[in-house]
Design a protein with these regions (language model features):
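FIC/Doc superfamily catalytic core
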Residues: 1-185
């Protein structure tokens, strides 16, 4: 699914945040990571610390690779769920009513994704990259949080405005609900 530029625009009304730096100590990065955790209903400080560690690792890198994605997932999930940290899923899963690609296809699909979107540098391409990453659902858990870390990294590397998606369940018209609609969920 291709997303138009109009759909990728962030409105000031919904809280645009323009980060023109990849400074890993940025207060705005921490807010992005906190909201990213909250979207998944992960509220503890350990998970936020690990998200920040994953960001500090990721932001130093210049090229998006399969190994980089796996290491980012490993850092993010090491204390939360060590058995799956840094490993692609080994079972079939569904997200809501959507059946994700078979686990046997995940490695190939993620490799193709890296080739197609690894150098994405426009708002439209970066949003499409994020949507396609989430649809591949390469991990047993942590997909949304890793996907949003990559999304943030690509926006910062491209010197584009960063939108913090507010976790606002159960509001059916809130930012989080609109965000999930991008994935057809």
């Amino acid at each position: 699914m291709q997303i138009s530029k109009a759909q990728t625009r962030n409105s000031a009304k919904s809280g645009d945040i323009n980060m023109k730096t990849n400074n890993p100590s940025s207060k705005l990065v921490k807010e992005f990571l906190r909201e990213s955790n909250y979207i998944e209903r992960v509220y503890d400080d350990v998970a936020l610390e690990d998200a920040y560690k994953a960001w500090r690792y990721l932001v130093k890198k210049e090229e998006l690779t399969l190994i980089l994605i796996l290491k980012t997932h490993g850092i993010l999930m090491k204390r939360l769920w060590p058995e799956i940290a840094g490993r692609m899923r080994m079972e079939d899963v569904r997200v809501g009513s959507r059946i994700c690609p078979s686990w046997q296809l995940v490695y190939g699909l993620l490799s193709e994704w890296v080739k197609k979107y690894g150098k994405a540098n426009t708002e439209e391409d970066i949003l499409n990259a994020h949507i396609e990453f989430e649809r591949r659902h390469p991990f047993r858990d942590g997909n949304g949080r890793v996907g949003r870390l990559i999304f943030l990294w690509q926006l910062v590397k491209a010197d584009l405005p960063v939108k913090i998606i507010k976790a606002d369940w159960p509001d059916p018209n809130g930012e989080q609900a609109r965000y999930y609609k991008l994935f057809g969920e």
